[in-house]
Design a protein with these regions (language model features):
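Alpha-helix termini
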Residues: 11-13, 143-146
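Generic amphipathic alpha-helical segments used as scaffolds and interaction surfaces in large
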Residues: 83, 87, 122-126, 158
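Short amphipathic alpha-helical interaction segments
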Residues: 161-166
Length: 166
């Protein structure tokens, strides 16, 4: 109940309102530290962070927080470990704010990627032969990161099911 009471008392517009990133970061750390469930505490903490941020702007956020944290799990767990044993959490809040900025940047880049993908398909999608279509679809599935090391001949042959002679 203490966590829920704190979360309610710090809501935007309330007497105890906190800055958005501060509230979201504290909520995340607080929930992970109390660890009320056997499983899923991290997911719930991320959801609470996103809820806190959404409340501050009055709409859902576009931040791929889970994606960024998953990609840098060791740094995330290290930051939690360093900051869950005392009341000095400035380092955690700095880490969390930087992570949120990365998550927002990733989301914006993903939106741009999807828009450009759609434009490409609208413009020339009907001109692809079957093999080209398979390769383009597979490349797009790799998302922003793309193929590690680029699209090699071996990747192309594997995707299209063709031989080198083709």
């Amino acid at each position: 109940n203490a966590f829920l009471n704190w979360f309610a008392k710090t809501t935007p517009g309330s007497e105890g309102e906190l800055p958005a990133l501060t509230r979201a970061g504290i909520a995340h750390l607080y929930f992970v530290c109390i660890h009320p469930f056997e499983d899923g505490n991290g997911r719930i903490a991320r959801a609470l962070s996103e809820k806190a941020l959404s409340q501050s702007i009055g709409q859902p956020t576009l931040a791929a927080l889970s994606r960024i944290l998953h990609g840098k799990r060791k740094a995330y767990y290290d930051a939690l470990e360093l900051n869950n044993k005392n009341n000095e959490i400035t380092d955690w809040l700095v880490y969390f704010a930087k992570t949120i900025l990365k998550a927002q940047s990733y989301s914006l880049n993903m939106i741009d990627f999807l828009i450009e993908k759609t434009k490409l398909y609208d413009r020339i999608g009907s001109q692809f032969n079957k093999r080209q279509g398979k390769v383009i679809e597979r490349m797009f599935r790799e998302g922003l990161e793309g193929f590690k090391g680029g699209l090699s001949t071996e990747n192309y042959l594997s995707i299209t099911g063709t031989s080198r002679a083709t």
